[in-house]
């Protein structure tokens, strides 16, 4: 597949205990279906050829011979397929029995990975039948007429990724084998399991898989036994899980009486980016325990260009579902804690905020109000200043006044019209020419007022600019770009809008709620150009630089994962397929890349402000970039889309 995606599957077949022929037929069918769907690697549950619950039947030579014959049958009937298959079976080695994962492709056995940790407590008695990989040196064994490497340290290299395998209990160990495999190069871990059910156990298993995939910065594909295993003492629900760096991509239906195939794509390019930037991961490589890895080469012949089955979130910064309340509260708590520390450190009891009636200044004012409450300071120490200019509309002006009044802050109104007119006269600028000088003069006049009032009152100017504006450079240098502490600098516009809406619907009186919801509904604008003949906003930011939901998506993929324009375009085309056509996405992606490079000089001298999410543009923290770097390569790729 393209752009670093590897399609994987967790198969959960119906089994008959000790009926290897039946089980082989089920496995063959699922391999064929998966191959037809473009799956590149598929894993089956633990001991899937025999069934996990054979117990003392594992000591029967007939069962072991039938298992080997079943493997031969499966390989013969799938040798024309490109897919790499991982199935579970008992393997005899040096007069001992290994609980093993057998990896094969096109009729060739690539390697055998034995289980390392054999549970022998409560309902588990695996040491009664099997021997641990710890008791065997890396060696070779004859299986199905082939000489095959056997080791828990096998890594399988494909043209697109590297994967390793652990088996069931291995994941439950304090230091799972997958940790070492990941440090040695495995980007995807496959786990074949036979986890029986118990009250609350499923959630615990999910947390283990999630945490291990996150800790290893890896994909994790988990397949556990399902219907058909013996229910003499326990029940198996058939759990299939696919995780990527802690995030669930796909899962099976529990307690299904039918076979299941859980399919998704692991973004190995994303995982590589995470590992490159995570210096702690790299530092651990030198301390990796265990024997050296043995690399086995494989091939992917399946080059079909298939669409993704995994979902691509169009608004990656915005919390979803049940996380909404918790995430919004956490965001406010971070902003409040950051501002509170600065106020305590400076012994400051006054802040000055420019209130435009727009989203950013609204959020900043709400943060100030909550911070003052937390510090037991009177809200009258918050000086909200509305500064109407040539483009101010009645809607934003009235919303600014209503918001400040409802929050109980000190209200000041200082028009910038006369001072700007005088300034235009001083510099010989024609007021009818609405160019960059006309616009930026107003922004700088407002900043001058805020700074001077702050000096008068011994206060701090609180910046309102957000992450999206910083990425695009949509701020006047030394105008609204500058403050004494910026509380919104790590929050993208899509999230600002969402937060304001959340505040409106949670804990605000009816009058304040109406004002906040109208602010959310107001077109985003700096209001530096006079309104239209009907008094409505004429200068709409998203008409000029593009939709913020697109730019926030571009920013997240570009900054968080280091993706190139072609991959960002590919992902955006999926995420916004019902909203924007590809030409529109290409247009705004090109503008994003151009402006991001052009406007770095503004980000190189940002005021202090708290980091809130995983993406930040602080020049002292997350993003250090020369102001004169060339965008040529990125723009060229945009042109070629």
Predicted regions: what is each one?
Residues 6-7, 15-18, 23, 159, ...:
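ATP/NTP-dependent adenylation/nucleotidyl-transfer catalytic domains that generate, transfer
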């Amino acid at each position: 597949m393209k752009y670093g995606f590897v399609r994987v599957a967790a198969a959960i077949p119906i089994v008959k205990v000790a009926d290897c022929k039946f089980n082989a037929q089920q496995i063959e069918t699922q391999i064929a279906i998966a191959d037809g769907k473009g799956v590149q690697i598929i894993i089956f549950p633990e001991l899937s050829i025999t069934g996990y619950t054979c117990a003392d039947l594992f000591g029967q030579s007939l069962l072991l011979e039938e298992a080997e014959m079943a493997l031969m049958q499966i390989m013969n009937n799938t040798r024309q397929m490109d897919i790499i298959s991982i199935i579970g079976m008992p393997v005899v080695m040096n007069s001992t029995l290994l609980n093993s994962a057998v990896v094969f492709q096109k009729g060739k056995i690539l390697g055998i990975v034995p289980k390392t940790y054999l549970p022998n407590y409560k309902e588990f008695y695996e040491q009664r039948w099997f021997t641990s990989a710890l008791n065997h040196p890396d060696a070779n064994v004859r299986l199905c007429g082939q000489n095959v490497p056997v080791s828990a340290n096998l890594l399988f290299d494909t043209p697109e990724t590297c994967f390793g395998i652990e088996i069931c209990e291995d994941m439950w160990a304090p230091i799972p084998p997958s940790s070492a495999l990941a440090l040695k190069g495995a980007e995807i871990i496959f786990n074949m399991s036979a986890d029986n059910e118990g009250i609350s156990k499923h959630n615990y298993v999910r947390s283990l898989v999630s945490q291990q995939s996150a800790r290893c910065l890896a994909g994790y594909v988990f397949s556990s036994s399902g219907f058909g295993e013996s229910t003499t003492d326990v029940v198996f629900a058939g759990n299939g899980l696919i995780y990527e760096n802690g995030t669930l991509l796909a899962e099976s239906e529990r307690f299904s009486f039918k076979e299941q195939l859980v399919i998704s794509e692991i973004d190995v390019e994303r995982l590589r980016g995470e590992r490159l930037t995570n210096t702690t991961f790299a530092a651990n490589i030198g301390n990796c325990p265990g024997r050296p890895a043995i690399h086995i080469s494989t091939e992917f012949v399946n080059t079909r260009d298939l669409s993704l089955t995994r979902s691509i979130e169009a608004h990656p910064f915005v919390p979803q579902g049940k996380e909404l309340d918790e995430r919004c509260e956490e965001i406010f708590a971070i902003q409040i804690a950051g501002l509170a520390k600065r106020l305590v450190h400076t012994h400051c009891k006054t802040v000055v905020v420019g209130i435009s009636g727009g989203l950013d200044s609204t959020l900043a004012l709400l943060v100030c109000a909550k911070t003052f409450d937390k510090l037991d300071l009177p809200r009258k120490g918050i000086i909200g200043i509305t500064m109407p200019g040539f483009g101010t509309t009645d809607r934003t002006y009235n919303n600014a006044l209503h918001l400040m009044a409802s929050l109980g802050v000190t209200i000041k109104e200082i028009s910038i019209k006369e001072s700007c007119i005088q300034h235009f006269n001083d510099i010989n600028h024609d007021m009818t020419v609405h160019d960059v000088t006309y616009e930026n003069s107003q922004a700088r006049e407002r900043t001058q007022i805020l700074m001077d009032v702050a000096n008068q009152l011994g206060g701090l100017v609180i910046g309102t600019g957000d992450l999206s504006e910083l990425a695009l450079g949509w701020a006047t240098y030394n105008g609204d770009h500058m403050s004494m502490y910026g509380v919104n600098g790590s929050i993208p516009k899509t999230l600002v809008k969402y937060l304001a809406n959340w505040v409106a619907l949670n804990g605000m009186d009816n009058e304040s709620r109406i004002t906040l919801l109208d602010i959310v509904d107001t077109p985003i604008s700096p209001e530096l150009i006079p309104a239209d003949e009907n008094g409505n906003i004429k200068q709409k930011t998203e008409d000029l630089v593009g939709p913020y939901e697109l730019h926030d998506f571009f920013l997240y993929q570009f900054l968080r994962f280091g993706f190139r324009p072609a991959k960002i375009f590919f992902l955006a085309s999926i995420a916004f397929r019902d909203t924007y056509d590809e030409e529109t996405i290409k247009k705004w992606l090109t503008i994003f890349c151009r402006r991001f490079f052009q406007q770095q000089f503004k980000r190189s001298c940002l005021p202090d402000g708290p980091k809130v999410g995983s993406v930040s543009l602080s020049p002292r923290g997350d993003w250090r970039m020369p102001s004169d770097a060339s965008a040529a390569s990125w723009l060229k790729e945009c042109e070629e889309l």
